Curated annotation (Swiss-Prot):
It comes from Homo sapiens (Human). SMART domains: FGF (SM00442). The keyword Plastid does not apply. Belongs to the heparin-binding growth factors family. The keyword Secreted applies. It is found in: Secreted. Keywords: Disulfide bond, Glycoprotein, Growth factor, Secreted, Signal. The gene is FGF18. GO terms for molecular function: growth factor activity; type 1 fibroblast growth factor receptor binding; type 2 fibroblast growth factor receptor binding. PANTHER family: FIBROBLAST GROWTH FACTOR (PTHR11486). This is Fibroblast growth factor 18. Residues 164-174 have a biased composition (Basic and acidic residues).
Length: 207
């Protein structure tokens, strides 16, 4: 003969159902938040204050620095070369940047063919890159418009086309370096010498 479930069994079933619903809601919120962060990282931010930095980008492959030579881009610049000094503007709260040559005032951009070019106007999304800090402490720059295409150079300092690049290739790995002659950006640690204060001896007066 069939017996009705006890009140305790019903409560347990309701509790398990409630726990399952909570887990589903938390999972959906986590997914939505990740999507929100990814969208914000890829989107332009015209509200936040932009941060401007000056440094060089040392190419792991060529052993030289990225140069913005007007419309031509290379990675053959020596340390301190005027064409290797880059003004880097943070474009969003995430890690999007625009890179401009300080000397030529041309922007580093990647066109639809994946070729690195210099442009006088950097407002196009082709001139925006997503900055990725890798596990080996190098930095990679992925095109914000053409996902999966990276800034890269050959051993001779020639630009590689975006479709032929991958994040794990040494060709797309760079190290940030401050330009020569800018000690205010790389002040060495200075030790301060502290001398022990000598005890003052009071003069004695005859009674």
């Amino acid at each position: 003969m069939y017996s009705a479930p006890s009140a305790c069994t019903c409560l347990c079933l309701h509790f398990l159902l409630l726990c399952f619903q909570v887990q589903v809601l938390v999972a959906e919120e986590n997914v939505d938040f990740r999507i929100h962060v990814e969208n914000q990282t890829r989107a332009r931010d015209d509200v936040s204050r932009k941060q401007l930095r000056l440094y060089q980008l040392y190419s792991r492959t060529s052993g030289k620095h990225i140069q913005v030579l007007g419309r031509r881009i290379s990675a053959r610049g020596e340390d301190g070369d005027k064409y290797a000094q880059l003004l880097v503007e943070t474009d969003t709260f995430g890690s999007q940047v625009r890179i401009k040559g300080k000397e030529t005032e041309f922007y580093l951009c990647m066109n639809r063919k994946g070729k690195l070019v210099g442009k006088p106007d950097g407002t196009s999304k082709e001139c925006v890159f997503i900055e990725k800090v890798l596990e080996n402490n190098y930095t990679a720059l992925m095109s914000a418009k053409y996902s999966g295409w990276y800034v890269g150079f050959t051993k001779k300092g020639r630009p590689r086309k975006g479709p032929k690049t991958r994040e794990n290739q040494q060709d797309v790995h760079f190290m940030k370096r401050y330009p020569k002659g800018q000690p205010e950006l790389q002040k060495p640690f200075k030790y301060t010498t502290v001398t022990k204060r000598s005890r003052r001896i009071r003069p004695t007066h005859p009674a």
